[in-house]
């Protein structure tokens, strides 16, 4: 084996042995037959299936308009966050089916699914959505109740005497 004489030799040796598999993957657009991007999002016990396509900004959740399904403005704000971050409000028609959990968990699941669908439709948005944390699955779920306790951590009342 030949010994390397300088840093330049070392750099040349490193560039010759680099493999194209180690380079960052190129993200491509993923669309179905109707030209829609599809993704699933999860939060707590809720699972949302999200389809997006270019349009005028209509959002349908389980066959109902978003204003009637998510009546609280806070939940609609959670839903719109990914679109506002990437400046794509009113540019996509969004269809969602969501089940499980409560309304807050469902709104978080829709946000997660919508963020993933946006990256499938426009791969260049991935870095800005990832920076905001919208592509990361929130792992927090309800802690189970333990036997010998009133709740997950709360003990029964203790009487010393």
Curated annotation (Swiss-Prot):
Biased composition (Polar residues): 1-21
Gene3D superfamilies named among the record's database cross-references: 3.30.230.10
Domain of life: Bacteria
A GO BP entry: translation
Keyword Repressor among UniProt keywords: no
Cellular component GO terms, alphabetical: cytosolic small ribosomal subunit
Keyword vocabulary terms for this entry: Ribonucleoprotein, Ribosomal protein
UniProt GO molecular function: RNA binding; structural constituent of ribosome
Keyword Cell wall biogenesis/degradation: no
Ranges where the record places region Disordered: 1-25
A Pfam family reported for this protein in Swiss-Prot or TrEMBL: Ribosomal_S9
Cross-referenced InterPro entries: Ribosomal_Su5_D2-typ_SF, Ribosomal_uS9, Ribosomal_uS9_bac/plastid, Ribosomal_uS9_CS, Ribsml_uS5_D2-typ_fold_subgr
PANTHER family with a match to the protein in the record: RIBOSOMAL PROTEIN S9, SMALL RIBOSOMAL SUBUNIT PROTEIN US9M
NCBIfam families to which the protein is assigned, alphabetical: PRK00132.1
Protein name: Small ribosomal subunit protein uS9
């Amino acid at each position: 084996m030949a010994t390397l004489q300088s840093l330049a030799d070392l750099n040349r040796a490193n560039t010759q042995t680099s493999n194209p598999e180690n380079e960052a993957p190129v993200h491509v657009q993923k669309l179905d037959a109707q030209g829609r991007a599809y993704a699933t999002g999860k939060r707590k016990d809720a699972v949302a299936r999200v389809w997006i396509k270019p349009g005028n900004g209509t959002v349908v959740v389980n066959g109902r308009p978003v204003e009637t399904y998510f009546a609280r403005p806070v939940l609609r704000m959670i839903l719109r966050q990914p679109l506002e971050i990437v400046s794509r409000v009113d540019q996509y028609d969004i269809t969602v089916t969501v089940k499980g959990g409560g309304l807050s968990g469902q709104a978080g699941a829709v946000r997660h699914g919508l963020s993933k669908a946006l990256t499938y439709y426009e791969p260049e948005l991935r870095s800005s959505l990832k920076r905001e944390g919208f592509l990361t699955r929130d792992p927090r779920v309800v802690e189970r109740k333990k036997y010998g306790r009133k709740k997950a951590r709360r003990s029964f009342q203790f009487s010393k005497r």
